[in-house]
Each structure stands twice: as structure tokens, then as C-alpha cells.
From Swiss-Prot:
Listed result of changing I153H: In strain: Isolate MFL-CHI1
Upper taxonomic lineage: Eukaryota, Metazoa, Chordata, Craniata, Vertebrata
Name used for this protein in its record: Cytochrome b
Cofactor: heme b
Gene: MT-CYB
Natural source organism: Martes flavigula (Yellow-throated marten)
GO MF annotation list: metal ion binding; ubiquinol-cytochrome-c reductase activity
Ranges that cross the membrane: 33-53, 77-98, 113-133, 178-198, 226-246, 288-308, 320-340, 347-367
Keywords: Electron transport, Heme, Iron, Membrane, Metal-binding, Mitochondrion, Mitochondrion inner membrane, Respiratory chain, Transmembrane, Transmembrane helix, Transport, Ubiquinone
Amino acid sequence: MTILRKTHPLAKIIYNSFIDLPAPSNISAWWNFGSLLGICLILQILTGLFLAMHYTSDTATAFSSVTHICRDVNYGWIIRYMHANGASMFFICLFLHVGRGLYYGSYMYPETWNIGIILLFAVMATAFMGYVLPWGQMSFWGATVITNLLSAIPYIGNSLVEWIWGGFSVDKATLTRFFAFHFILPFIISALAAVHLLFLHETGSNNPSGIPSDSDKIPFHPYYTIKDILGALFLILVLMVLVLFSPDLLGDPDNYIPANPLNTPPHIKPEWYFLFAYAILRSIPNKLGGVLALVFSILVLAIIPLLHTSKQRGMMFRPLSQCLFWLLVADLLVLTWIGGQPVEHPFITIGQLASILYFAILLIFMPIISIIENNLLKW
């Protein structure tokens, strides 16, 4: 067996990635989210596959096909709600995973970090298109509003929007192509995740102290396999509590109303995991400016490695940076809250201030505080 696992081309890759991988001895539970994201992805692909067996991507029947899944298909309701709430769990793990990377300086592995940003965009695109498929009110109007943002692109904007729609409005062609893309993207995400892992295993994992751990490595199995299984059990517990007790907690009631192009919902808003970006988009009165801010709110992560001015890698021993990091987390929570509120007096100003603070922390305060901490080390 030992000979086979070290010689067989396929077994060698699997064993070197999940069994014999040298891992730092001090990585905390914050390093569990990579495996949890893998589990979420597998879960989403499997539940999605079973949903696709019964779903019809036609404007006339899409809404009723989802109803049919919930009412008539054996355990269809649990598959549907596991898929919908699985997306929420996916994003919770994603945000915590990115937050861990920011806190502990994992962005100092630029290849892994940049593939991660591409993965984030791909998952966001997949989730957006998936939200359109049930063809409820929020599906239709969400698709209309978000795709319409592309019309802000100079010269080609309007043509681009009509090209994406496949007509002059969000209609049958749009739904069909969104279903096709929603089906294929998770497999592209799987391939990207494999590349993400490939780059990570070139350098080895970071650890909480930020100090190279080459002299102190332990095998991944059994130490971290058992740790990952514990994390997975906790993830499944939370997901199943959500699915079985309050499956609609994170959804929008408007999506139980079939799509009607003649009736606009009072408040158009995306799923909760996009609200922070939606708040940044709305905080800028100009359409093109808003779209740029929306894209840059995620793309800003790509320039974080260039703005690293500290002599230490992580924030474990940098209390000033820690304060700033948690201020950023609080700011993102405020943005998420604002994204779900109507566009009226106090919320507009709060949203604009929170958006300015978001970019200011990442682009201005973090590098400056790091320089101050470097100077404090000299005393």
C-alpha cells in the first residue's frame, strides 16, 4: 500500500495533498474554512444536480417547476432548501476565509491569493445567476437591475446589456442562458479550487504567528483530517438547523410571488451576502461610479499585498492593526445592514460614510498604522 501511494500517479497527488502533506503544527480553527468551502462546493453541486433533474428553465414553467420540486418530488423540499441555504453557508465560510487571509497575512502568497479573488468573483456570479432561476419577483427584478448596471459602460453598454439579455428585456432567453451558466460555473470553480490548492501546496500553509514553519511540520493525516471532520460536522449541523427549522430566514418573501414585469417590488435587494457590495454601489449617485465602486470593493483585495508595509506578516502581534481590522469587520456589517434598507434620509448618509470608511481602512489606514507599528518596535 505504501509503495502504491507513493508511486501511482493519481494516488500520489491525492496522498500528497490530503494525507502526507506537511502542515504547520500550530494552525488554528481559522484554517478549517478551506476544507469547509470544499464540502460546501460538493454539497451545492450534488443538490444542484438533483434540482436540475426537475427544474425547467422556461419563463412559463420555472416558478411552477420549483413549486413542483417542493411539493411533489420525494424529499424535493429538503434538497431545494439545502441548496438555497447551502449558498449562505458557502458565503459565510468564504467571508471568514478571506478575513482570515487578511488578518494573518496569507495574501503574501500572491498566486494563491489572486486565484482566490477570481474564485470569489466566480462564486458571486454563480450565486447571482442561481437567484434568478426560481423566477420569483426578486429573481426577475434583481436580474433586471444588476444586468442593467452594465449599461453604464461607455459606448458598448446598451448593446452589451441587450446581448446578455438575448432581447430587449430580461425574458426567456435570459433565464435559459443563466441556467446554462449556473450549471457549468461550479465545475469551473472546482477546477480553479484545484489550482488554488496547487499554488498553496507550492509554498505550504501560513500559520497564526506568521513565522516560517518549515522546521516544525506535522503530517496532515490524522491531525488535521480529524480537525476538518469536526468542522464539517459543525457546518452540517448549522446548515440542517437552518434548513429544518427556518429555511426561509435568509430569503426574501417577494420571491414567493411569480415574476411580473408590470409590477415592481417596493424594495429591490439581492441576497444578504451581496448587501455590503450593493450598499457601496448605491452610495455613489453616479451610475458608472457606482458600478466601478462595486467592482473595486472586491478587486481592492488584489492590491492588498502591494500595500503591506509591516515588518511582521500577520496581525497576531500588532494590536493597532487588530483594532483597525475589527473596525473593518464592523463597517462591513453596517454596510450589509444598509444594503437591506430603503434609499431614504439617514440610511443614504450612513451608507456613504461606511463606504468611504471601507476603502479608507484598506487603502490608507492599514498601511499607515503598519508603518507606525514598525517605528514602535524600535523603541
